[in-house]
Amino acid sequence: NLIIFSFFALFIVSGMDARRGELFTALFRRVPGGIQRVRDANVCTAEDLAAEIQTFDESILLVGDGALRYAEVFESLGRVELAEQGLAHPSARAMVQLAHARAMREEFVQPWDLEPIYLRKPDAEINWSTRNNSK
């Protein structure tokens, strides 16, 4: 959410580099006062994301370090603009803007209610399991 809040396009796709030839992706639409998630976050290849992007009729802003890493996959798609390198990572400014918009709507969350979203197991956990299972 933090990366895409800074942009003014109506439809935004966030593609963060997930390593292993994959991207962490999420789709958003800009709405008055903030952004609206169109699709939940997932893990996919750049080719899978490109195929999904082609199903939309609107112009799309593609942001994130994964979008830049696999730019050659997306450059041939019509209606897709890649955000520049300086905007590839979340910014504190965008986080404050999102938090302010929620605070104005009195949408408060207690710190202990925040939960991270894990789309897959971390490499270290997978490597540990693989190493222990091979013994």
Regions from the PLM with identified roles:
Residues 1-90, 104, 118:
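Surface "functional belts" at beta-alpha junctions
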